[in-house]
Amino acid sequence: DVLGSRGLGDVYKRQGKKPCLSLRELEKQVNTDLDMLVNIVDGQMTVCELVDRYLKTKTGVRQSTKQGYVTMQRLLAKESFGKKTIRSVKTSDAKLFLIKLQQEDGKSYSSIHTIRGVLRPAFQMAVDDDILVKNPFGFQLAGVLVNDAVTREAISKDQMRKFLKFVHDDVVYCKYYEVVYILFHTGMRISEFCGLTLKDIDLENRTVNIDHQLQRTSDMRYIIETTKTDAGTRVLPITEDVAQMFQAIIEDRNAPKVEKSIDGYRGFLFYDDNGMPLVAMHWQHRFNHMVGRYNDIYRVQMPNITPHVCRHTYCSNMAKSGMNPKTLQYLMGHSDISVTMNVYTHIGFDDAEEELKRMEEFRKAQAEVEQKKEKPMSQKMFKVV
């Protein structure tokens, strides 16, 4: 039989199934697994079944990633493409499905990129298992979809200065000034900032310990997760002005009488009216309101500024100032130096022009110094023969 000589009991022991299912539930589960195994043998597995099987191999993923998988499975379950057998899916079918998602369903490029990011390895698994000969999703998205993704650009130093001044002077938003300043001058991820506790901030030695982040799931559960990458776990040195901002936040901290523990962490910097720590979404909304208010007042509009734009801007400013790339990589918590150099650093014409002017001024100054070192030649230096 398809299970071999070991039998169903051995299969369930190997898979770690708990013996707490009712007989009817166990029978249903066995039938489901048998159907899937038979489908593998005769090649009639559907796209939905393939994705479900692939996702079972993805263990140890973050909560946010799991939520994305559930969304993906729900989407496929509603699509006729999800009911197609995997052997019937051609490359043109795969392309047309993604085009439909963008042109008919209005899905964004980034969303479709994420969907393809599950379908391609799922079909590759079928190829590796000798069920398929070719991966129908083994093509590049360029030329198939219109890339409408909005690049999160860093803002200029002048824009940063104007926005900080506006927040500082505004009677409503001045209470957020310290947070905006810190994000612009440390490059912290907003989830890292939200996860900071009093124990993580050492004002005496001017360091901030970053080894976790605070998240809120779609079902409104608050969880602590490790940093995005191993490199994200770091001790961040801070300048005197940033230390003063943290000092002000700590002094004005309005914590509930009984601070709720989130996965063993308490002592967060900001709380909402329900006594729960603020998360990334709260700050995203506040940034939206601040930018909206600024653009209502001033004729020259401010581009969209988010906590992540603050991170881009910090990285860009540090790169333009001449900071060593490896140092910048550490401060940003990037696992790959190419991310630091290629994604977060935004060098444009104005920056190139300014750099050339600096080099020209340096060469002129160097030439003047060398000219002063040379003694002028006079007639007295020659002997009359």
Predicted regions and their residues:
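N-terminal core-binding DNA-recognition domain of tyrosine site-specific recombinases/integrases
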Residues: 18-19, 40-43, 52-131, 149, ...
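Basic, Lys/Arg- and aromatic-enriched nucleic-acid-binding interface segment
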Residues: 113, 128, 132-196, 204, ...
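Single conserved hydrophobic/aromatic residue that forms the stacking wall/gate
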Residues: 1-15
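Short, polar N-cap/turn motifs at the start of nucleic acid-interacting alpha helices
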Residues: 200-207, 323-345
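Short, basic (Lys/Arg/His-rich) helix/loop patches that form interaction surfaces
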Residues: 105, 165-176, 186, 236, ...
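Basic, Lys/Arg-rich DNA-contacting stretches centered on the C-terminal catalytic core
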Residues: 144-147, 191, 204-237, 241, ...
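C-terminal secondary-structure termini that scaffold catalytic or DNA-interacting sites
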Residues: 205, 218, 223-233, 240-242, ...
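Catalytic-site neighborhood detector that most strongly recognizes the C-terminal catalytic loop/helix
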Residues: 146, 154, 213-216, 332-358
